[in-house]
Structures are given as C-alpha cells and as structure tokens.
A protein has these predicted regions:
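Short glycine/proline-centered loop/turn elements that form peptide/ligand docking sites
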Residues: 92, 115-118, 135-140
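Short amphipathic helical patch at the helix-1/turn junction of helix-turn-helix
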Residues: 78, 112-113
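Acetyl-CoA-dependent GNAT
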Residues: 4, 8-83, 92-98, 102, ...
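Conserved catalytic-core motifs of GNAT/GCN5-like acyltransferases
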Residues: 108-111, 123, 128-145
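Conserved G/P- and acidic residue-centered "switch" motifs that form tight phosphate/ATP-binding loops
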Residues: 86
Length: 165
C-alpha cells in the first residue's frame, strides 16, 4: 500500500469531508453530512472521525460512533484517486481494533442497496447482511443493514440494536 497515515480529523478538515460525503456517499440525495455535523462528531467523546492522509491530501475518512454494546459506522469514503490501494481496509481495521480495545464488540452499518462495490467490500471484511430497510435514504433508496462481531471477525449478531447515528 502507498504511504498513508491514519489520524483523527482536524476541525479544518470538516468542509472537505462534507464535500467528500456529498460526492461519494450521498450523491443524488439531499446532503445530510454538513461540516457542522461532522465537527459535532469530532468533538463528541463517543465518536471518531478518522482520516487517511497521503502527504497533505485526504485520501479517505470514516465516522464511527460508539455505543455501550454496538458501534455504528456512519460514513466511510475513499477518494476515487486512492481506491484499490487498501485505504478502506486499513481504516476499517483500525476502527475494528479500536472498538475491540474499547470493549465494543459489534460494529453495525448501513449502505445503499445500489452500492454493490461497498456491499462486496464489507462482505470480504466479515460483515453479514442483517436485512434491508425500504426508503432508508430520504424515502428514496433502500439500505442494506450489516454487522460484524469483531471478537470472532466473522459472525454478525441477529437482532442487532443500532445506536443513534
């Protein structure tokens, strides 16, 4: 993998992350992830906003919120110029190891049902489909709900409770 460093996002990164979310995750939807919402997560003690940097540019990022029993991956995005270089895998591995260390053993997430590449990626990371939610994305698009138990790396927990995003 190219040289990428993982680090907590800085407040100055919030606008760039909001643009990345709008272009890479929320395309075709009303933007839900504003710079102020991302900044809130940066400041919240139960959230992490993690960026992968190559030199001074942001190659990818994730936002995850920790609950007592379950962590919720809110966003994961990698700039197209940095895809297929292990950036998403490295971010997810870091988040999973951190959750395990914190005693939060389940990570849950939702993704757009039309995002076949993301679905395949999460499946290779050991996430299992728990179900589908019609109209999850602003009443427009179906979501796939997935989860992984990071203790075993392979088993999702049926009936998973999701913390508030």
């Amino acid at each position: 993998m190219d040289e990428y460093s993982l680090q907590p996002a800085r407040i100055a990164d919030a606008r760039r992350l909001a643009v990345m979310s709008q272009e890479l995750v929320e395309a075709g939807l009303r933007p839900a992830w504003s710079a102020s919402r991302i900044t809130w997560h940066m400041r919240h003690p139960e959230s992490i906003v993690l960026v992968a940097r190559q030199d001074s540019s942001i190659a990818g990022f994730a936002i995850m919120r920790y609950g007592d029993d379950v962590a919720h991956l809110n966003l994961l995005a990698v700039d197209p110029a940095h895809r297929r270089r292990g950036v998403a895998r490295r971010i997810m591995t870091w988040l999973e190891e951190t959750a395990l260390t914190a005693g939060t053993f389940i990570i849950g997430l939702e993704l757009r049902a039309t995002n076949e590449a993301a679905h395949a990626f999460y499946a290779t990371m050991g996430y299992r489909e728990l179900g589908r939610v019609s109209g999850y994305y602003q009443g427009i698009e179906q979501a796939i709900r997935m989860a992984r138990d990071v203790r075993t790396g392979r088993d999702a927990v049926p009936g998973l409770k999701q913390p508030a995003p």
